């Protein structure tokens, strides 16, 4: 028995954070245990540095920036592992898809070790031309040209993901409709995974939630190779 990891992804300006928070509130209203995480997070030194780079306060080579993003995601792996053990629904606003899409847009490969493969991902897709902010308001990656490249990389990722692991939603739908889609699918994923002990890692390994000891907390000891796990659990 474990919680689930739900990711909400998309390019800039499709209201990922809005939908993630609305999902959190809807689940809490139904008495579910929920945690919302946003990447990059200002709550760590790594996250603060990333935000300074994105806001063009600090300059950094692209390769170094993506290494920093990877490190930042891994900073939360232990926390997510504990929350899954405690049967929480963990909502992440940007996660590994964003890491891959933005890195690939810069023609950089990143390490996916120690990163969870979300149980389900919602991709908010723009179905109109992207609006470019005035130059003085643009953060790093926010030019229309760059966002188009990043969007293409997201589509490349989606094409490799099993169809039962994600849902693409037009971002300009009525918010109440988007709410219902995301909420209902999240509940279905939670109920489906109630009896599972494992969650898949993005590098193909598996994390055994059942064996995680929250007293002598060493989550890395619970990572296993696929020894029939995928076939047995349908992960």
Curated annotation (Swiss-Prot):
Pfam families per the UniProt record, alphabetical: Thymidylate_kin
Keywords: ATP-binding, Kinase, Nucleotide biosynthesis, Nucleotide-binding, Transferase
GO biological process: dTDP biosynthetic process; dTTP biosynthetic process; dUDP biosynthetic process
Keyword match ATP-binding: yes
The reaction(s) this protein catalyses: dTMP + ATP = dTDP + ADP
InterPro entries in alphabetical order: P-loop_NTPase, Thymidylate_kin-like_dom, Thymidylate_kin_CS
Gene3D superfamilies named among the record's database cross-references: P-loop containing nucleotide triphosphate hydrolases
Family classification: Belongs to the thymidylate kinase family.
Free-text function comment from the UniProt entry: Catalyzes the conversion of dTMP to dTDP.
Name of this chain's protein: Thymidylate kinase
Species assigned in the record: African swine fever virus (isolate Pig/Kenya/KEN-50/1950) (ASFV)
Top-level taxonomy: Viruses, Varidnaviria, Bamfordvirae, Nucleocytoviricota, Pokkesviricetes
Primary gene name: TMK
């Amino acid at each position: 028995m474990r919680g689930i990891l739900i990711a909400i992804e998309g390019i800039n300006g499709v209201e990922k954070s809005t939908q993630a928070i609305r999902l959190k509130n809807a689940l809490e209203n139904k008495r579910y245990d929920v945690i919302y995480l946003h990447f990059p997070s200002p709550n760590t030194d790594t996250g603060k540095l990333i935000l300074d780079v994105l806001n063009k306060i600090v300059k950094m080579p692209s390769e170094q920036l993506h290494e920093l993003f990877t490190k930042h995601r891994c900073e939360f792996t232990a926390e997510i592992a504990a929350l899954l053990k405690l049967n929480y629904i963990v909502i992440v606003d940007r996660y590994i898809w964003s890491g891959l899409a933005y890195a690939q847009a810069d023609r950089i490969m990143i390490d996916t070790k120690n990163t969870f493969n979300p149980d389900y991902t919602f991709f908010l897709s723009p179905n109109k031309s992207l609006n470019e902010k005035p130059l003085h308001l643009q953060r790093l990656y926010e030019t229309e040209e760059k966002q188009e490249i990043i969007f293409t990389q997201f589509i490349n990722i989606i094409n490799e993901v099993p169809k039962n692991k994600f849902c693409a939603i037009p971002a300009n739908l009525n918010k109440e409709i988007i709410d219902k889609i995301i909420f209902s699918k999240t509940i279905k994923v939670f109920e489906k995974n109630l009896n599972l002990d494992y969650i898949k890692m993005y590098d193909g390994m598996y994390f055994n939630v059942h064996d995680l000891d929250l007293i002598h907390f060493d989550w890395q000891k619970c990572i296993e190779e696929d020894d029939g796990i995928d076939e047995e659990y349908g992960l």
